[in-house]
Amino acid sequence: MKKSIYRSLKTQQHPLLLRRPLPPKLPKVPLLKKKVRIVHTVKAREPKEETYGKFDPDESAFVKMDQNVSQSQRPTSTQTICLDYDHKALERVVNIFPHQHRVRRFHWKVPKSTAGSMFIPRCLSASSRIFKNTLSQMKKRAKKSSKKEVKEDGYLTKKTFNTLVLSKEFSKPSPTSYSRFIASKFKPLGTQFHPAPKISGYSQELPLLRDVKRAALSPVPSTSSVIPEPQWSERTHPSAAPSKVVLNTGSLPPARSLPTPVLPRKPLRQAMIENAAAAAAAAAAAAAATTTTTTTTTTTTTAVTTTAAVSGKTEAHKPPETVQRTTRTIGPDAHVLRGEGFKAVAATRSETVLALTTLAIINCQIYGRNALNLKGFFLANCPDLTPVAFQLVYLNLSFNDLNQFPIEILYLQNLQVLKLRNNPIKEIPSEIHLLTYLRIFSIAFNYITKLPDGLFCLNYLEELDVSYNEIENISNEIQKLRSLEKLIVDGNPITSFPPGILKLNLIKLQIENTFTCSQFWLESSWNDPQQLTQICSLFLVKNKLLDYIPDAVRKSLKSTSECDWCHGPKFGEGFRIIRSCDIFGVSHVPIMFHVCSSTCYRDIRETSFVLEGFPSRRIALHMDWVKESKVSNVSFYL
């Protein structure tokens, strides 16, 4: 027995500890990650009209956005409603939790004496989690008290939750640490309230409206800046707007006469002309009045004399009464229209066009102009250019109806540019060589079939445009145009060029839409056999046997052309052969050679170059289709 008592006493003696005691073991606090605490407000009474009718529309609330918060949270908005009707301050109801379901409801009353911003925690503190029994009792009491208040209030029938009441008297902005989306979940109760639309997806400044019943929420700005609300003394108070506007017309100024409009200023010369015309009109009117008076006087005198003669009475001649003419006076402030009338003249279209062209020529003559442009006048005949024959340098007669080359152009001695595009001209006269200083000549889109030899006598010609005509071949005399730099022969049925073109110094050659491709060369160079007289004449000339034949026979042996290869006499047409070369920036330009005999034909067929130009230059020839083993049919006749 004693031993047991001793053991019990021994066990009751605690050993002396040399360290701090451990804290008591408390039950583990569960991690309520998904549980959300809801703020609940006490129901308020219905507002009166004079209470919410005096709200300041300039008040606004700002909510700061935090970039650390997930952007997938629900959008928020705020609405201004009045909950405390005894106090004149406004309160804002906001939702502090994003989710509605699976949350516990509890009440959080914010006192009116709060003067600063509030920080709403994400979850409750640890002490509230531990003493949940006490909190549950507090909830029950709050529910009972709220039920009593709901029964006392006849207008409110449903309890609001998930809301936080913020008084209007908060003058300080929310702290920067509280950066969350706030969504409005408050549904106003009663028949006098209207639901506000939901704003989703963005935020904006929320103004406090005058009428809470018809207040429409605006988005809250997404900027991170926080602007403090203005003080009550700085806000503008609404003033009663007048319901009726009375306009007093008794104080209007008396009616005044409108000032007389001032006539526009006129040039001195125009004023002088108008004054002279007015004076002439006045003189004519005076002359007409005098004539009328004289006629009336003569008629009256004759009538009186006849009456006296018939009656046989001798009465003294009485002066006739003068005719009185009333003159209308024009006041200084009267408006007078002054102008000139033009009588309509019946004229045909050709006469009108001819008058316009004549006027253009007269203007060139008066002002000393050296260019005349009559493009697009559709002239059937060229006007007389004699007045400007020595001064015109540029003449454009394109897009007209000239059927023939205008002879009037040949008298323009100093003409340098002549354009005759789009005219139905069929022939160019050989007298065109009279235009000695002509540099640019364009006669495209006509019906020209042949270029005259006089055209090749223009030593200063630099550009020749004969495109889209009906030219089939060009004379070898083109080699005389040593100043020619640009030749345009597009759109012509031409198959080849003469050898004289190799002597030119062309910079640009255009041969588009022509028959110059190699498929037409063989057909274009087909030869016929020479006549016997032509062969004999060529044999006598080359062997110098003309002195041994009679004169009658010698006259028939005259040569009319020259061989393009040996430059000797050529009787008849001779033989034709096409060789191509790359020249003037164009590849495979076909050159048609007219030779006198089969010997020259064989030589030019086998050669690979030609010497042309001044100074003489070597031009390579392409050995394309002429490399056939079979000799042309012309050789069988020799």
Curated annotation (Swiss-Prot):
InterPro entries: Leu-rich_rpt, Leu-rich_rpt_typical-subtyp, LRR_dom_sf, LRR_domain-containing, LRR_R13L4/SHOC2-like. It comes from the Eukaryota. Residues 220-241, 306-325 are annotated as: Disordered. The keyword Flavoprotein does not apply. Pfam families: LRR_14 (PF23598). Keywords: Leucine-rich repeat, Repeat. LRR repeats lie at residues 389-412, 413-435, 437-458, 460-481, 482-504, 532-556. The keyword Ribosomal protein does not apply. PANTHER family: PTHR48051, RAS SUPPRESSOR PROTEIN 1. This is Leucine-rich repeat-containing protein 63. The gene is Lrrc63.
